[in-house]
């Protein structure tokens, strides 16, 4: 499965408390370079509409571009890896586990341009990314029994998620949930099963109202205990053409602490009312936003006058996790 997703983001990060200092030559391994690259990674994670947060893996290319004398322009080509934290999870990406390679990891290559105004400390950030899962052949060669990634809208994945959700709703007296997003589906053998990851949201309906086509149910979009991230396994055959009825399953759901005003609260609005599957690796998202960035002490290179702007030496940088 070698399809691609294009994630196109355009925005402005404003940091009134950002400070900078003139520093020595920077390459793809210096702390100053990584500080600037982290601005791009932070921006991607704050505005990604689907799926999972991304962690920096390799700074592949770093260029200093021409400027008008008032700004410093950085261009990066970054290799990122998918973590196990959903974008609605408030856990800082630094504390998120990178998805292991044998669990069909996904990488993202991003072109990031940061235009830093040295008088106002404003950063304009331009990002374009493409995402690719690891090779099925390589995974099966190294781990024949490991689960293989499927499209989130695969019929077996969708049916299995709905089956688990119905089982949850049967047990939760007074609380009814619906699927907010199917973010991951995998198939494995020995024993044959479907591994699922999805987000659910509580709705303001009874069980009877939820099954009434004429009754409009509305999800709670903020507050305590209304949104949860679930990891489930449904043991069923890929050859089965019927929807699951009494299959054995395992499931664990964790409440997400998503509050009104949280950086991702607007993403809930994006999903609500649109039974959603993560777009996987073949869609485009755009946004124009402003958000504050925390205090960062960043180095600014002294030489930014080269109009041909070749990549700096010392690139690509170190691999922080692994290469797909």
From Swiss-Prot:
Key word Magnesium present: no
Compartments, record wording: Secreted
Protein keywords: Disulfide bond, Glycoprotein, Repeat, Secreted, Signal
Taxon lineage: Eukaryota, Metazoa, Chordata, Craniata, Vertebrata
Signal peptide: 1-19
Source organism per UniProt: Protobothrops flavoviridis
Disulfide bridges in this chain: 28-315, 85-96, 110-129, 143-146, 205-217, 230-253
GO molecular function: cysteine-type endopeptidase inhibitor activity
Name of protein: HSF-like protein
Pfam family name, one: Cystatin
GO cellular component: blood microparticle; extracellular matrix
Superkingdom classification of source: Eukaryota
Function: May not have antihemorrhagic activity.
Glycosites: 95, 204, 282
Protein family according to the UniProt entry: Belongs to the fetuin family.
Chain ranges of the Cystatin fetuin-A-type domain: 21-130, 141-254
Keyword Glycoprotein included in the entry's annotation: yes
SUBUNIT field: Homodimer.
Main location: secreted
Tissue: Expressed by the liver.
């Amino acid at each position: 499965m070698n399809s691609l997703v294009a994630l196109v983001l355009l925005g402005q990060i404003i940091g009134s408390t950002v400070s900078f200092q003139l520093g020595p030559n920077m390459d793809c391994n210096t702390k100053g370079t990584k500080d600037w690259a982290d601005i791009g990674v932070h921006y991607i994670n704050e505005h990604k509409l689907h799926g999972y947060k991304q962690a920096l893996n390799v700074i592949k290319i770093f260029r200093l571009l021409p400027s008008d004398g008032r700004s410093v322009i950085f261009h990066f080509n970054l290799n990122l890896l998918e973590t196990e934290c959903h974008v609605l999870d408030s856990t800082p990406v630094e504390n998120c586990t990178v998805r292991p390679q044998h669990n069909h990891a996904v990488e993202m290559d991003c072109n990031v341009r940061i235009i830093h105004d040295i008088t106002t400390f404003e950063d304009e950030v331009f990002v374009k990314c493409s995402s690719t899962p690891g090779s099925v052949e390589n995974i099966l060669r190294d781990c024949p029994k490991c689960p293989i990634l499927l499209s989130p809208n695969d019929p077996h994945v969708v049916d299995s998620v709905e089956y688990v959700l119905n089982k949850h709703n049967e047990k939760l007296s007074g609380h009814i949930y619906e699927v907010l997003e199917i973010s991951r589906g995998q198939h494995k053998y020995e024993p044959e099963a479907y591994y699922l990851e999805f987000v659910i949201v509580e709705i303001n309906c009874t069980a009877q109202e939820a099954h009434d086509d004429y009754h409009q149910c509305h999800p709670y979009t903020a507050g305590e205990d209304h949104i949860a991230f679930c990891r489930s396994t449904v043991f069923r055959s890929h050859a089965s053409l019927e929807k699951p009825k009494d299959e054995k399953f395992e499931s664990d759901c964790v409440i997400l602490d998503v509050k009104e005003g949280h950086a991702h609260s607007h993403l809930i609005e994006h999903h609500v009312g649109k039974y959603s599957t993560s777009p996987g690796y073949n869609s485009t998202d755009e946004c124009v936003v402003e958000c504050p960035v925390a205090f960062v002490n960043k180095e600014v290179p002294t030489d930014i006058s080269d109009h041909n702007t070749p990549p700096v030496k010392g690139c690509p940088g170190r691999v922080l996790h692994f290469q797909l």
